[in-house]
């Protein structure tokens, strides 16, 4: 199979995997309100937690993280057999992330990408993902703001990658994901500056 075609097919598959919104699916399974209708209106684990159902929030978190991990893991392990190179892995990472942000199955209304980005980073390199996760945990524990922790982790992730592996195509993908994640947190940034951002564990209003 042609290398370019293989790369494109892996990327399309990754986008479709990313388009599965676990926040919406899990909420329906638990007969909860659509997460796009309350709280931050973001279909993500933090907003599902505002429903008061911790199990649903955990499943959402795991699902969103798993889809990022699986998409990148598949191309890393099977892509080389079809000629997919490092740039192809970078493209797949971006594709699954874009699927989460703008899912074709849910009218292109998706989440902010925190859990999916973490899954992607873990698949790219375990130490990279772990360093980014620890950054999030430390900031979240200290300040109790999930969004603020995500922003700080997003800023540090490219630096972690650059320190570990230097400049390459995957670094560009990590930078792109960080920029998109920060962009998707625009409203949260405004709320943080205004002192109106919801803290971790707060219930929906």
UniProtKB/Swiss-Prot annotation:
Record carries keyword Transmembrane: yes
Record's catalysed reaction(s): an acyl phosphate + sn-glycerol 3-phosphate = a 1-acyl-sn-glycero-3-phosphate + phosphate
The EC number(s) this enzyme carries: 2.3.1.275
GO-annotated molecular function: acyl-phosphate glycerol-3-phosphate acyltransferase activity
Transmembrane annotation, as ranges: 6-26, 55-75, 89-109, 120-140, 162-182
EC top class, as a word: transferase
GO CC annotation terms, alphabetical: plasma membrane
Chief localisation class: membrane
Pathway: Lipid metabolism; phospholipid metabolism
Keyword Lipid biosynthesis listed: yes
Matches recorded under InterPro entries: G3P_acylTferase_PlsY
Source organism superkingdom: Bacteria
Subcellular location: Cell inner membrane
Membrane topology value: Multi-pass membrane protein
Keywords, comma-separated and alphabetical: Cell inner membrane, Cell membrane, Lipid biosynthesis, Lipid metabolism, Membrane, Phospholipid biosynthesis, Phospholipid metabolism, Transferase, Transmembrane, Transmembrane helix
Protein's GO biological process: phospholipid biosynthetic process
Xref: SMART domains: G3P_acyltransf
Subunit (UniProt): Probably interacts with PlsX.
Family to which the UniProt record says this protein belongs: Belongs to the PlsY family.
Xref: PANTHER family: GLYCEROL-3-PHOSPHATE ACYLTRANSFERASE-RELATED (PTHR30309:SF0), INNER MEMBRANE PROTEIN YGIH (PTHR30309)
Function: Catalyzes the transfer of an acyl group from acyl-phosphate (acyl-PO(4)) to glycerol-3-phosphate (G3P) to form lysophosphatidic acid (LPA). This enzyme utilizes acyl-phosphate as fatty acyl donor, but not acyl-CoA or acyl-ACP.
UniProt protein name: Glycerol-3-phosphate acyltransferase
Gene designation: plsY
């Amino acid at each position: 199979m042609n290398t370019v075609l293989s790369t494109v097919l892996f990327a399309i598959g990754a986008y479709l995997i990313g388009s599965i919104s676990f926040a919406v699916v899990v909420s329906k399974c638990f007969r909860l309100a659509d997460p796009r209708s309350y709280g931050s209106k973001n279909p993500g684990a933090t907003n599902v937690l505002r429903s008061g159902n911790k199990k649903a929030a955990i499943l959402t978190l795991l699902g969103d993280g798993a889809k990022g991990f699986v998409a990148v893991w598949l191309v890393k392990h099977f892509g080389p057999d079809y000629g997919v190179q490092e740039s192809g892995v970078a493209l797949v990472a971006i594709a699954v992330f874009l699927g989460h942000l703008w899912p074709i199955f849910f009218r292109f209304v998706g989440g902010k990408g925190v859990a999916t980005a973490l899954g992607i980073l873990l698949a790219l390199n375990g130490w990279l993902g772990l360093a980014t996760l620890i950054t999030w945990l430390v900031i979240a524990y200290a300040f109790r703001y999930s969004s603020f922790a995500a922003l700080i982790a997003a800023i540090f992730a490219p630096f972690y990658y650059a320190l570990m592996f230097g400049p390459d195509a995957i670094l560009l993908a990590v930078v792109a994901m960080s920029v998109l994640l920060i962009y998707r947190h625009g409203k949260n940034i405004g709320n943080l500056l205004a002192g109106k951002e919801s803290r971790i564990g707060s219930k929906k209003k």
